[in-house]
């Protein structure tokens, strides 16, 4: 859905590398003001310097943020908003890909994934909605995954569950805000080259970072309720995953 609305001031979590940094570069090239946060401030500082040199007319604010520090999330969002003069789009992108087979005795890895990808996402969602409700409008973008469509066996079980939770929260919000000027988009990326996917054993239908980021940004700008990206081949595959019995989902993991 094309809304005709330009979201000028964009906040991205997990912006120090991978898809987050890629989206920041793409939006900067379009002249958007950016509020970028992540744990690795050295990379954020380098990214800000790079973008400020290329696009001197845009505003860029950066801040350290561990999204698992729940009390800091609203503080950092508010500080970044003040620096660039408001926020009208929040991209909940921060996440990790740790995981172990369920029952392997490595609870810590699966717990960390659920906490970072789902619980911390909920904190970011609540914070963004509070900001948007105060300003009267906004666009909330939730980065889920094609693995959030169906449970998968193996080391990505907790990751898939965390992204399914994000997708479900997004669906609830789309219904909740259907008649209000706050739009909610759930994106389900397939395998896109990044630091996270570099550690993955699966490279199924992997696309390079530039191609993946281009697809993500194009989808974000359309502001759909939900989209698999890149559309081909993942939109048809997502439909297939819905109906596959669990024992046949291993290839997607």
UniProtKB/Swiss-Prot annotation:
One of its GO terms (cellular component) is membrane. Its EC number is 1.-.-.-. The active site is at residue 159. The keyword Nucleus does not apply. It holds the Pfam family adh_short. PROSITE patterns: ADH_SHORT. Substrate binds at residue 145. Keywords: Oxidoreductase. GO terms for molecular function: oxidoreductase activity. NCBIfam families: PRK08251.1 (NF006099). PANTHER family: DEHYDROGENASE/REDUCTASE SDR FAMILY MEMBER 7B, DEHYDROGENASE_REDUCTASE SDR FAMILY MEMBER 7B. Belongs to the short-chain dehydrogenases/reductases (SDR) family. This is Uncharacterized oxidoreductase MT0971.
